[in-house]
């Protein structure tokens, strides 16, 4: 994995983080994506899974669709996709099928990530065995504006962010699997917790000092 950055990458990632904050204000989870060509934004998007009631409406998927329409073609060679969070497996397959040349993200996703967990972004077998469908392995740049990306999630819900960190769901991209703190399964899913935490954010502000065991009382 390549870990480097320039002024353009930082500017584009700053926009992704800004979009993630917009998503949070609109009642979505804080994900934002930008697609650029030669340093110019071609498309951008936020998650709309809650608004649309559609689990496939990830920011990366929406941005890819918009970029393809703007470009007038399916394949996005020489384009860069930026996201505040490492794309999931679903989004990673779409990135490969769209032939995106470069992927840049801030926070890694070791449990669900299309690179760190499932290796889709680095799997050259896709393009070797099905070259008619999948593009070459993209360059991957990670860790851009890491602290700023973390702060956006922390601002969205401090208590949810603490739980996410404890479960090792979003981490610095270089973290090794052995360093991820795996939490035992709970009776209710992470999706349920995040949804409840978001809906009750006003109540949570007064509970931040309480132990995490009190999540079961929500």
Question: What does each of the following model-derived ranges do?
Answer:
Residues 42-49:
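Short beta->alpha transition motifs characteristic of CBS
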Residues 51-61:
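A short, polar/charged loop-to-alpha-helix boundary motif
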Residues 65-102:
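Helix-adjacent hinge/juxtasegments
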Residues 49, 83, 107:
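Residues that line or immediately flank small-molecule/substrate-binding pockets and catalytic motifs
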Residues 1-23, 93-218:
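Zinc-dependent deaminase
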Residues 16, 20-23, 33, 43, ...:
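Small-residue (primarily alanine) positions within well-ordered alpha-helices
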Residues 31-39:
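Short beta-strand scaffold segments in enzyme catalytic cores
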Residues 26-30:
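Short, flexible loop/turn motifs enriched in small residues
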């Amino acid at each position: 994995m390549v870990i480097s950055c320039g002024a353009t990458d930082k500017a584009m990632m700053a926009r992704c983080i800004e979009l993630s904050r917009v998503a949070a204000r609109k009642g979505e989870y804080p994900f934002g994506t930008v697609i650029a060509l030669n340093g110019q934004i071609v498309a951008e998007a936020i998650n709309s899974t809650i608004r649309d009631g559609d689990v496939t409406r990830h920011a990366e998927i929406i941005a890819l669709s918009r970029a393809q329409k703007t470009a007038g073609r399916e394949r996005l060679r020489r384009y860069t996709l930026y996201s505040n969070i490492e794309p999931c497996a679903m989004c990673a397959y779409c990135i490969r099928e769209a032939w995106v040349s470069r992927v840049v993200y801030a926070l890694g996703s070791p449990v669900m990530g299309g690179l760190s967990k499932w290796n889709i972004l680095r799997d050259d077998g896709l393009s070797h065995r099905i070259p008619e469908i999948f593009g070459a392995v993209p360059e991957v740049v990670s860790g851009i504006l890491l602290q700023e990306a973390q702060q956006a999630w922390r601002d969205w819900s401090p208590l949810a962010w603490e739980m996410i960190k404890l479960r090792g769901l979003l981490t610095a991209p270089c973290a090794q699997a052995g360093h991820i703190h795996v939490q035992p399964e709970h009776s209710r899913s992470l999706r349920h917790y995040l949804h409840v935490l978001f809906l009750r954010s006003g109540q949570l502000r007064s509970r931040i000092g309480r132990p995490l065991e009190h999540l079961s009382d929500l």
